[in-house]
Amino acid sequence: MSFKSINIQESAQLISEGTLVVDVREPGEYNEAHLVDSVLIPLGEISAEKVNQANPENKKILIHCRSGKRSKVAANILVNQNYAGEIFDMDAGINGWIESGQPVVSDN
C-alpha cells in the first residue's frame, strides 16, 4: 500500500465525493483556518488507530498540512502502519488550497 499526492482540483473532487479530510497541522494553525468538516490529528499524534476512529469504514482519506511536507510524513506513517483505506496527500497544502480560492473556516 502507498499513497498518492494530488493537486488542489483533484483534492476538491475527492472532498465533494465525501472523502474524509485529515489535517495534520497543530491546533493553533487549525483554529486559524481549516477545511470544512476536516478532522484534526496533529502529525505528532497521527496513527492508523486514530484515523480508523475518525473513519471507521476505512474509506478514502485526504491528508493535508500547511505546505505539503508534514502531510507526506503522515501519509508514510499510515502506510507503514498498514492503514487499510486509500490515502491521498494534498501536495500544495492549505496554502495552495487558499491561494486557489477554495473555502476555509475559522474557529477564532
Residue ranges, per PLM feature:
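Short, surface-exposed ligand- or partner-binding patches at beta-edge/loop junctions that are enriched
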Residues: 64
